[in-house]
């Protein structure tokens, strides 16, 4: 399964990639921002995309809308270290399938992947 991790924090992307590799996912791509993420999505067609909702420039909500308009079947999991009802609502309204609190752990990541990988 191809997975794309979008986050402006290189350290967080490395942690996510390591967790995914340890869980057996071998095709993990990383992107640090909006444009890089769109390019990676178009090129790799990942089955699941983890998107930080707070990105520099255009937001993760904007990215989610953009991906969903190009591919309505996309499976996007919103992520943020800031949890509030408005952000969760905006993420889900934009098309995200789920919301994951950062930093995450193997159990939470595994649960989300099991739920949305089918």
PLM features per residue range, with description:
Residues 33, 59-62:
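Acidic catalytic/metal-coordinating carboxylates
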Residues 52:
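Active-site residues of response regulator receiver
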Residues 30-48:
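Acidic, metal-coordinating helix/loop segments flanking the phosphotransfer/catalytic sites
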Residues 10-29:
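Two-component/phosphorelay signaling modules centered on CheY-like receiver
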Residues 86, 104-113:
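C-terminal output helix
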Residues 56, 84:
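The feature encodes the CheY-like receiver
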